[in-house]
Curated annotation (Swiss-Prot):
<keyword id="KW-0808">Transferase</keyword>
<dbReference type="InterPro" id="IPR023346">
    <property type="entry name" value="Lysozyme-like_dom_sf"/>
</dbReference>
<keyword id="KW-0573">Peptidoglycan synthesis</keyword>
<comment type="pathway">
    <text>Cell wall biogenesis; peptidoglycan biosynthesis.</text>
</comment>
<dbReference type="GO" id="GO:0008955">
    <property type="term" value="F:peptidoglycan glycosyltransferase activity"/>
</dbReference>
<keyword id="KW-0472">Membrane</keyword>
<dbReference type="InterPro" id="IPR036950">
    <property type="entry name" value="PBP_transglycosylase"/>
</dbReference>
<dbReference type="GO" id="GO:0071555">
    <property type="term" value="P:cell wall organization"/>
</dbReference>
<dbReference type="InterPro" id="IPR001264">
    <property type="entry name" value="Glyco_trans_51"/>
</dbReference>
<feature type="transmembrane region" description="Helical">
    <location>
        <begin position="20"/>
        <end position="42"/>
    </location>
</feature>
<comment type="similarity">
    <text>Belongs to the glycosyltransferase 51 family.</text>
</comment>
<keyword id="KW-0133">Cell shape</keyword>
<keyword id="KW-0997">Cell inner membrane</keyword>
<keyword id="KW-1003">Cell membrane</keyword>
<dbReference type="Pfam" id="PF00912">
    <property type="entry name" value="Transgly"/>
</dbReference>
<dbReference type="InterPro" id="IPR011812">
    <property type="entry name" value="Pep_trsgly"/>
</dbReference>
<dbReference type="GO" id="GO:0009274">
    <property type="term" value="C:peptidoglycan-based cell wall"/>
</dbReference>
Length: 245
């Protein structure tokens, strides 16, 4: 039998106390972060977000790399955005948006299998609400930790806000190119018209851009964009909008 000295016992107790303390600090910080997110979302029930995490990061990069450049963004009410664009985005990004709870389990499982096969994260299976959660609070980093936080924020959004409000914030904050955010800025940047006047074909082409907005901004008029837009345009008629629409 090996005797344990008093010094060793004291060291073990100290390490245990330190672990408990560190765990408590981490748990407290995590909880405070979640409460901050929840409070922000509750505020956005009646106040429009001024910016998003993506916008702030992009603004910093633009000021560093091309100082005269600025973020293009103009908030417009939900009813001042073309129904064509709303239908195009639902047809392209989240066909069950109006009725789902913010998650598409089948898409998440498919993304998991794809990521496992590739040995890295290449797909996320994100719904419109999940995309909004990421845009508002998180980064472009691809990791399972970030994905877990995204799922928590998605639950908060779906619990606190109704579908129309979620879609309104999404439409006004999603990225559509280098420094271009929201439907109004995108409509004026690409077509020189307000978002309320976007036609079906214009809306379908904008919807194609969302997975890789900066790439499509730099490669406008690509054959793929036209082909994919045609597919989205055919699906738009079946796209179900939030109830009030």
């Amino acid at each position: 039998m090996v005797a344990v000295s008093g010094t060793q016992r004291t060291r073990t107790v100290s390490l245990a106390r330190w672990a408990v303390y560190a765990g408590s600090v981490f748990a407290g910080a995590w909880l405070a972060t979640q409460l901050f997110y929840l409070a922000q979302i509750a505020l956005w029930s009646f106040v429009n977000p001024g910016s998003t995490a993506f916008m702030r990061t992009d603004a910093w990069r633009l000021s560093r790399d091309t100082p005269p450049a600025q973020i293009r963004h103009q908030w417009v009410p939900y009813d001042q955005i073309s129904r064509n664009l709303k239908r195009a985005l639902i047809a392209s990004e989240d066909s069950t948006f109006a009725t789902n709870n913010g998650y598409d389990v089948d898409a998440i499982l498919q993304a998991w299998e794809k990521n496992k096969a590739r040995g890295r994260i290449v797909a996320g299976g994100s719904t419109i609400t999940q995309q909004l959660a990421r845009n508002l609070f998180l980064s472009r980093e691809k990791s399972y930790i970030r994905k877990g936080q995204e799922l928590i924020i998605t639950w908060m959004l779906e619990t606190v806000l109704d579908k129309e409000r979620i879609f309104e914030i999404y439409l006004n904050s999603v990225e559509w190119g280098r420094g271009v955010y929201g439907a109004e800025a995108a409509a004026r940047y690409y077509y020189k018209i307000p978002a309320s006047r976007l036609g079906a074909w214009q809306s379908a082409r904008l919807a194609v851009m969302l997975p890789k907005p900066r790439w499509f901004d730099a490669h406008r008029g690509s054959a793929y964009q036209a082909q994919r837009a045609a597919v989205i345009a055919r699906r738009m008629g079946a796209a179900e909008l939030p109830q009030s629409e």
